[in-house]
Amino acid sequence: MSESGLKEQITGKVEKTKGQVKEGIGEVTEDRKLKNEGKWDKTKGTIKEKVGKVKQKISDGLDNKE
């Protein structure tokens, strides 16, 4: 199992959650900038999470060949 892949997945989930919180606060306070920052953080988190999953699958595949 790839440690870097797992680490990237966790980092992505944290960033995505942070984005959801920011977006929610921005929505409630009608702060467009904060809301947009939250959306961007969610997007970055989703990407990191998916990259981590791919890294893990590749690593698992390489481990199975050994």
From Swiss-Prot:
Q: Where is this region: Disordered?
A: 1-22
Put simply, this protein is called UPF0337 protein BA_0987/GBAA_0987/BAS0923
Question: Which top-level group of life is the source organism from?
Answer: Bacteria
- State one Pfam family annotation: CsbD
Composition-biased stretches, type Basic and acidic residues, lie in 13-22
Similarity comment text for this entry: Belongs to the UPF0337 (CsbD) family.
What organism is recorded for this protein?
Bacillus anthracis
Task: Name the residues that span the membrane.
Answer: none
Q: What is the lineage of its organism?
A: Bacteria, Bacillati, Bacillota, Bacilli, Bacillales
